Design a protein with these regions (language model features):
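Residues on the lipid-exposed face of transmembrane beta-strands in outer-membrane beta-barrel proteins
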Residues: 43, 57-59, 103-107, 117, ...
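Repeated loop/turn-to-beta-strand initiation elements of outer-membrane beta-barrel proteins
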Residues: 53, 113-115, 148, 157-162, ...
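Residues that define the transmembrane beta-barrel architecture of outer-membrane proteins
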Residues: 51, 97-101, 140-146, 160, ...
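Transmembrane beta-strands of outer-membrane beta-barrel pores
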Residues: 59-65, 119-125, 154, 168-174, ...
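Outer membrane beta-barrel transmembrane domains
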Residues: 68-70, 74-83, 230-356
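Long, hydrophobic/aromatic-enriched structural stretches that serve as scaffold segments
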Residues: 86-149, 153
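Outer-membrane beta-barrel biogenesis signature
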Residues: 24-81, 174, 351-356
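Extracellular loop and loop/strand-boundary signature of outer-membrane beta-barrel proteins
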Residues: 42, 87-91, 132-138, 185-190, ...
Length: 356
């Protein structure tokens, strides 16, 4: 693809998995999940020409909450003491707001091989009112897990591209954060996942009408290994596809994007004994003292979203884009539900050594 075409066909798709949850103000933490908006930016997925560095600066805002009166069945996951406590509480409000600022650098080693480094900085705000304690807001911020991806362009033509990627998540994000009570916050509230992860992906794009309509699709899979606390985040599958449309031929600087994003997430699991919380007494009853690998109830989800957006070429200096992700179907298994999310970003291409 030419440099000029790169500006016109910046696809808006990204997989920013930022799993964050809420803090529990007493001696246990509820395992509530909140996920981030996932729109993919085509300039992240493509392989730049040799010597070109494509830089994306992205801001992502994703609110999540439980429907009114729900969320009381979310269990308490205490990974530090290897305890999983089932719950049945009266819940009036549980919410999380996740903000992620991402620096993504995509470099063309050759015209077919690329190297991508993704650095997320996350801020998590959360609060829960479960009717058994005074709600205490929780806030944390810092670096998330760094992702490094090697990519190969299987089909480099003027109108199409098929890119195979293999990414590795490095456990650079904080995983030992503690609440104001001194207790370690549960795994899903930490900024990082605490262990390495693998992320194979396949990206495809084709110009249906040159310089006017561009089709794109992406499939990716994430597997994170069990961390030292015995907690393992569930596998994740993402499927996305859509069109980039230039509505006016004389206005090549203005692009509309329309896409559908589907995500399936497996239940998390942890090494733990099993308890049942009794809200009448405020104590937990031991059900099974054996510490074994157990699925965490109410984790895992299925989600389908429609994501419209725009991209503007800023005087051939950079590209700016904005996307709104609107839920179409969601099954969050009794946990927090992702609401309308927003993504804003800018793309800039630099010529480094080795290019022509």
């Amino acid at each position: 693809m030419t440099h000029k075409l790169r500006w016109r066909s910046v696809q808006l798709l990204c997989v920013l998995a930022a799993i964050t949850l809420m803090a529990w103000p007493s001696s246990v933490s509820a395992s509530c999940g909140a996920v981030s908006c996932f729109v993919v930016i085509g300039s992240q997925q493509q392989v730049p020409m040799a010597g070109l560095l494509t830089v994306n600066a992205i801001y992502n805002y994703t609110p999540s909450w439980t429907p009114a009166g729900q969320g009381g069945g979310i269990p308490f996951a205490d990974q530090e003491n290897r305890q999983l406590t089932l719950a049945n509480l009266n819940s009036s409000q549980i919410w999380t707001h996740v903000q992620t600022a991402t620096l993504d650098m995509n470099y063309g080693l050759t015209d077919r091989f690329g190297l991508q480094v993704t650095l997320p900085y996350k801020r998590v705000n959360s609060e829960a009112n479960l009717g058994v304690a005074t709600p205490v807001p929780y806030t944390d911020q810092g670096m998330g897990d760094m992702r490094v991806t090697m990519k190969y362009n299987l089909l480099p033509t003027l109108r199409s591209m098929v890119v195979l990627g293999v990414g590795v998540d490095f456990p650079t994000g904080t995983y030992q954060a503690r609440a104001s009570t001194g207790q370690m916050v549960e795994s899903t509230l930490q900024l990082g996942r605490g262990n390495f992860g693998l992320l194979p992906s396949l990206y495809q794009t084709y110009e249906i009408i040159p310089h006017r309509i561009n089709q794109f699709a992406l499939v990716s899979y994430r597997h994170t290994f069990k961390n030292n606390d015995g907690y393992q985040f569930g596998d994740e599958v993402n499927l996305s596809g859509g069109l980039n449309i230039i509505p006016l031929e004389q206005s090549q600087w203005f692009v509309l994007t329309q896409q559908l994003n589907y995500r399936w997430m497996q239940n998390d699991a942890m090494d733990a004994s099993l308890y049942q919380f009794n809200p009448a007494t405020g104590t937990s009853v031991l059900l099974d003292p054996t510490v074994k690998f157990r699925a965490v109830p109410t984790t895992g989800s299925t989600y389908l979203a429609y994501s419209p957006g725009i991209m503007l070429n800023l005087w051939n200096f950079a590209s700016a884009y904005a996307v709104v992700q609107i839920p179409v179907y969601r099954d969050f298994n009794g946990n927090l539900e992702q609401q309308v999310s927003y993504l804003f970003g800018m793309t800039k291409v630099f010529q480094l050594l080795g290019g022509s």
